[in-house]
Structure formats: C-alpha cells, structure tokens
Amino acid sequence: MISSLTGAFAFATVLPTPTRATAMVGRGVLTALPVAGAALGVLAAGVLWAGSWAFGDGSALAGVLTVAVLLLATRGLHIDGLSDTVDALGCYGPPERALAVMRDGTAGPFGVAAVAATLLVQSLAFAQSGWAAVFIAVVAGRVAVVAACRRGVPAAAGSTLGALVSGTQPRWVAAGWTVAVAAAAVPVCARPWQGPLVVALALACSAGLVAHCVRRFGGITGDVLGAALEVTTTIAAVGLAVR
C-alpha cells in the first residue's frame, strides 16, 4: 500500500519520492491516484481560499493562481496530454497517423485552442465555485483516470504508459471511487443533489471521450488519460459553479 501511494505521488505530482514514477506505474499506483488527487485538491483549495481572502470572493485572479499552482504541482503533464490528444483527434488518416501526430510533441492549432479554453474556463469556474468545489473537481479528474484504465479498455499500439495501466483497474475500484467522490460532493452545493449529479455528468463525459479515443486510436495512451483528467476537472468545476 505504501509503495502504491508513493508511486501515485511520484507519478502525479512534483513531490520528491524514493522511487521513480516510471518504475512503479501499474495497478496499485492507479488505484491510489485519487489519494494523490485529494492532496492536490487540498493544495488548490488552499490557494483559492487565500486568493479569495486577498482579492475578494469570486476574483478571477484567485482562480488563475489556483490553476497556475496546479500546473506547477503536476508539471503540466495532464494539460500537455490534452493538447496532444486534441491535435491527434483533429487530424485525418488512420490510427497510425493520428498516433504519430500525438507523439510528435509539437502543439498544433487545435491543441493550443483546447489548452487556452480549458485554462480559461477552469480559472473562472474555480473563482466562482469555491474551495470545496475545487477540491471535488480535482479529485474527480483523478477518478476519471482510474475509470479510463478499467478492465476491457485496451492500450494503443506503441504506448508505453498505456500498456502499463490499461485494463488494470477492476470495475468495482472505479465504481468505488466514483461513489466516494459523488458522496463527498453532496454538501458542496446548496442543492444536495447537484454535486453528485455534476460528478456523474463529468465522469460520463470523460468516459465518452475515452471511448471515442479507443475507436480512433485503437486504445488509450498517457495523453488520453491526461485529456480525460482535464475534461473531467473542467466540467465538474463548471457544474459546481452553477447557482
């Protein structure tokens, strides 16, 4: 258990750990990923609280600072995955061509637009939704990664990370984390049903994205997981900001 938690923090954050993340990524690390997400959620919630205290409730600057800290704390890994995935989905050709675009590493117009829109929406939604909602949104993003690695989901050809994590998560693990984050979302909004509904909707949208990527690329990659995380976080943040 300790090694899985250590691996989750090494994989998902900039925190120094005894073992390199690349040597530990697997079933246990993915199962523990929402725990690392909870730590990131606490960090993000704290930054938003401090920013709101300094600049006023609903300040866009507080939201921007929160997003910036999350980017630094995760090395920008997930937003880079979103960029590469959107560029790959935007190209024509067979799966091999799309995967080549994904692995090229050069941000195209689709990817740049997706990153800009995501960061803008997250910043504004975080500012409006409050610190508790930010915590839920960040954790939900990590739960989406667990769900994307459930059994039956293949890895794309040539994907190192995809081969390590695809199909490693029993469905009950993904379901358990989903129920946990949905339950935690109950007191976040004035309407008790809103939080769980938003979490379910965000995870459903993520599942749809992953399913489309499996059809387009033949399976998942590390970039697809990053895209699923960012999409889930963004949708959850927006939904929880609705009054």
UniProtKB/Swiss-Prot annotation:
TM annotation in the entry: 29-49, 53-73, 119-139, 170-190, 194-214, 222-242
Cofactor(s) needed by this chain: Mg(2+)
InterPro entries for the chain: CobS
E.C. numbers: 2.7.8.26
One Gene Ontology CC term in the entry: plasma membrane
Reactions catalysed: alpha-ribazole + adenosylcob(III)inamide-GDP = adenosylcob(III)alamin + GMP + H(+); alpha-ribazole 5'-phosphate + adenosylcob(III)inamide-GDP = adenosylcob(III)alamin 5'-phosphate + GMP + H(+)
Pathway(s) annotated for this protein in UniProt: Cofactor biosynthesis; adenosylcobalamin biosynthesis; adenosylcobalamin from cob(II)yrinate a,c-diamide: step 7/7
Keywords on record: Cell membrane, Cobalamin biosynthesis, Magnesium, Membrane, Transferase, Transmembrane, Transmembrane helix
Keyword Membrane part of the UniProt annotation: yes
Top-level taxon: Bacteria
Record's keyword annotation contains Nucleotide-binding: no
Cellular localisation: Cell membrane
Listed GO biological process terms: cobalamin biosynthetic process
GO MF annotations, alphabetized: adenosylcobinamide-GDP ribazoletransferase activity; cobalamin 5'-phosphate synthase activity
Role of this protein: Joins adenosylcobinamide-GDP and alpha-ribazole to generate adenosylcobalamin (Ado-cobalamin). Also synthesizes adenosylcobalamin 5'-phosphate from adenosylcobinamide-GDP and alpha-ribazole 5'-phosphate.
PANTHER family documented for this protein: ADENOSYLCOBINAMIDE-GDP RIBAZOLETRANSFERASE (PTHR34148:SF1)
Entry protein name: Adenosylcobinamide-GDP ribazoletransferase
This protein's encoding gene: cobS
